């Protein structure tokens, strides 16, 4: 695997020098300063590429080119936003950058309720608490019909939890959910959030799939033409939330994408932390079935709790994700490609790490502190080395 590291650009609290010392050779980044939907010019792409290469690294993967909400709702100026996206792909290819991670999650990107969940060893992790989320949705956001998405027990627990929250607890929970986490391109006030949710009131799973198909049928031929590999990131968490449909959550969703546009440019990001939240997702089987189309991996781990819809970011090698079998399947896919004469390694980043050690005393981006990701990268690197030596060094 190609070892990579997500970097949020010149304002990132983790420097490119830090990235190189961590042992990564590739950088995963995006032009976050360009408004959603606008074309990334060749000039701006080359500026960022030069910064990365001057640090002795390569720009391996774009994560992400945001998809304008008009495209997802099939309203407004969606045709122009699609044309802009096509041009950005052409410009990236012209600059030699050919792997693009993206997602099709409506309104929100990845979602957590607690950004400072304290683990038994004193380090901090990200957490999604189903009951806190229900309390937010029913008692703070007050979304009409929200109760239909929860069990009677969850509704009662959410009311009890809300009753114990201070004003600061409520404000913090609201910020965590709607203010935008690292990598998210949108943050909202409560009123703005309600208005954005309203745009989806008539969009169910079938309609969102229809809108996604329009996007794929416009984008994938361009990607194929210029040699760019599109790698869709799964929903996080991988299930409907806030009354919003989710359409990249299961192996059936992956198959639907392939059936909709059967091009090798139409591929996947294997995010084990996102897919792994669902107990019915067999990660190794997913890799084996869709291995030739996996162009990027996020190797992180999650642990489901007593309520199976509650989870936290766990240690990379101690979670519901069998990291050994996952890495083995990825390495096997790389060797399959090599046997076909392809030399491309699959870029991997350790994704979210725990806030730990000296980083506990620093300001950090939630999930993206340096030391926790350094630990995760080193652990995954060790697993891969052991697998390579044991099975492929003959």
Swiss-Prot record:
Coiled coil region boundaries: none
GO molecular function, one term: manganese ion binding
EC number: 4.2.1.8
N-terminal signal peptide: none
Catalytic activity: D-mannonate = 2-dehydro-3-deoxy-D-gluconate + H2O
Any one GO BP annotation for this protein: D-glucuronate catabolic process
Pathway(s) per entry: Carbohydrate metabolism; pentose and glucuronate interconversion
Cofactor entry: Fe(2+); Mn(2+)
Domain of life: Bacteria
UniProt keyword annotations, A-Z: Iron, Lyase, Manganese
Record-linked InterPro entries: Man_deHydtase, Xyl_isomerase-like_sf
Keyword Manganese included in the entry's annotation: yes
Primary role: Catalyzes the dehydration of D-mannonate.
HAMAP family documented for this protein: UxuA (MF_00106)
PANTHER family recorded: MANNONATE DEHYDRATASE
Homology family: Belongs to the mannonate dehydratase family.
This protein's name: Mannonate dehydratase
Species: Shigella boydii serotype 18 (strain CDC 3083-94 / BS512)
Gene: uxuA
């Amino acid at each position: 695997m190609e070892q990579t590291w997500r970097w949020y650009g010149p304002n990132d609290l983790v420097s490119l020098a830090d990235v190189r010392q961590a042992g990564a050779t590739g950088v995963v980044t995006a032009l976050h300063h360009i408004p959603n939907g606008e074309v990334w010019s060749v000039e701006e792409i080359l500026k960022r590429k030069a910064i990365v290469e001057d640090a002795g690294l390569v720009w391996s993967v774009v994560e992400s080119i945001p998809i304008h909400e008009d495209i997802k709702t099939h309203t407004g100026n969606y045709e122009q936003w699609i044309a802009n996206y096509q041009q950005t792909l052409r410009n990236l290819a012209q600059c030699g950058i050919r792997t693009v991670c993206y997602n099709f999650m409506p309104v929100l990107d990845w979602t957590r309720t607690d950004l400072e969940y304290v683990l038994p060893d004193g380090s901090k992790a990200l957490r999604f608490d189903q009951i806190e989320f229900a309390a937010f949705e029913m008692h703070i956001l007050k979304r009409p019909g929200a109760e239909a998405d929860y069990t009677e027990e969850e509704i009662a627990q959410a009311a009890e939890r809300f009753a114990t929250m201070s004003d600061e607890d409520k404000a913090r929970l609201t910020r965590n959910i709607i203010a935008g986490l690292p990598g998210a391109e949108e943050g909202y006030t409560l009123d703005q959030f309600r208005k954005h949710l309203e745009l989806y009131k008539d969009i169910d799973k079938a309609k969102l799939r229809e809108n996604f198909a329009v996007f794929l049928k416009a984008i994938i031929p361009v990607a194929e033409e210029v040699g760019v590999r599109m790698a869709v990131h799964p929903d996080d968490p991988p299930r409907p939330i806030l009354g919003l449909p989710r359409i990249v959550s299961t192996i059936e969703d992956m198959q639907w994408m392939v059936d909709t546009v059967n091009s090798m440019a139409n591929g996947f990001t294997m995010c084990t932390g996102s897919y792994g939240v669902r107990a019915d997702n067999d990660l190794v089987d997913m890799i084996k079935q869709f291995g030739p189309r996996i162009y990027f991996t996020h190797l992180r781990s999650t642990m489901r709790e007593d309520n199976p819809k509650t989870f936290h970011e766990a240690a990379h090698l101690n979670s519901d994700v069998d990291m050994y079998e996952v890495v083995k399947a990825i390495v096997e896919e790389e060797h399959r490609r090599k046997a076909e004469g392809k030399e491309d390694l699959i870029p991997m980043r350790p994704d979210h790490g725990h806030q730990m050690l000296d980083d506990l005393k620093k300001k950090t981006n939630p999930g993206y502190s340096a030391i926790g990701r350094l630990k995760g990268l080193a652990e995954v690197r060790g697993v891969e080395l052991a697998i390579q030596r044991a099975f492929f060094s003959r």
